[in-house]
Amino acid sequence: MRRGFDPRRTALAVADVLREHTPGVELLMPEERLGAPDELVSHVLHTESAFSVKAVVWQPGQLTAIHDHLAWCAFVVLQGVEYETLYRDHGDHLTEIGRAANGVGDASGFAPPGDIHRVHNTGYVTAISLHVYRADLGAEGASVRREYDLPLR
């Protein structure tokens, strides 16, 4: 990953690569694909100073808090469907600015600022996605910069 590239363009380029070379769920062991009933499960697959890769397992009904990220991110869905809602921050409230239903092979990328979203598995099967972050998850611990608890208008 060369330095100096525009973060948003880089995230979209990585998403293109993920879309073209989507791995199967077999990159996780069968027991890792189960998830957990009380929370989504992340499996960090690779981490270094330039980027990190993790797989996220979502059981039906699980969702994230509304959040943004430390750096750019790209993802591809390996199993199920992940519903994403995008938001804009107005300081004292958020507004919804978009929605997407991402199925198997769908990939996307985004970068701060303007990367506020929530992801939800509203389906009946466990969803699995692969994420690439421009963050060292080994050092940072997580990719989330901020969780939002603002009213929606």
Q: What role is predicted for each listed range?
A:
Residues A74-V76, Y124-E140:
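A short hydrophobic beta-strand segment most commonly corresponding to one strand
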Residues A71-D89:
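Glycine- and acidic-residue-biased ligand/ion/polar-headgroup-sensing regions
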Residues A65-H67, E84-T85, F110-A111, I116-T122:
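Short beta-strand His + acidic residue motifs that chelate non-heme Fe in jelly-roll/DSBH
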Residues M1-V25:
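N-terminal leader/capping segments at the start of a protein or of a new domain
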Residues P30-Q62, A107:
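A short glycine-rich, His/Asp/Glu-containing loop-to-beta-strand
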Residues R99, N121, V132, A139-R153:
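Domain-scale activation on soluble regions of proteins
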Residues D89-H117:
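Short acidic-glycine-tyrosine-enriched beta hairpin
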